[in-house]
Amino acid sequence: MRHGMSGRKLNRTSSHRKAMFANMAASLLKHEQIKTTLPKAKDLRPIAEKLITLGKGGTLHDRRQAHAILRDDAVVAKLFAVLGPRYKDRQGGYSRILKAGFRYGDAAPMAVIELVDRDPAAKGLDSGPTAEANDDDSEE
């Protein structure tokens, strides 16, 4: 019997699952909205909520705990400088999951997980090389 067992295995080893959710949490906090499968979004939500609660605390211990999960200095800095103060008056419920149809190819249910009161300008911010960056390199 699996009474009281929370979370899904998602056909991954525990280390792969831990790394995947750390990367997904960092992406969610960085871009404030990501698209993924519905089961992954449902498992990511409590991780992200706990990280934002740490960001509201702001102590050195909270910062170290967040860094142990995220492993990204820029995202940890944003968590404590931007997201923590933004949600200081909200008692939980920092994210929402919206269903986004089914994926072409395997018909997996997709979802968009986003932060409540998100900044629309953060979406896609610093997400990799762009055409503008390539043009700047060719001019040198």
From Swiss-Prot:
Gene Ontology CC annotations of this record: cytosolic large ribosomal subunit
Q: Describe its partners and assembly state.
A: Part of the 50S ribosomal subunit. Contacts protein L32.
Q: Name one GO molecular function term.
A: structural constituent of ribosome
Family statement drawn from the similarity comment of this UniProt entry:
Belongs to the bacterial ribosomal protein bL17 family.
Q: What's a single GO BP term from this record?
A: translation
| Keywords assigned | Ribonucleoprotein, Ribosomal protein
What is the name of this protein? Large ribosomal subunit protein bL17
- Which gene holds the coding sequence for this protein? rplQ
**Sequence segments annotated as region (Disordered):** 121-140
| Record has Membrane as a keyword | no
What is the source species? Answer: Rhodospirillum rubrum (strain ATCC 11170 / ATH 1.1.1 / DSM 467 / LMG 4362 / NCIMB 8255 / S1)
InterPro entries hit by this protein: Ribosomal_bL17 (IPR000456), Ribosomal_bL17_CS (IPR047859), Ribosomal_bL17_sf (IPR036373)
Judging by the UniProt lineage, the source's domain of life is Bacteria
Coiled-coil region? none
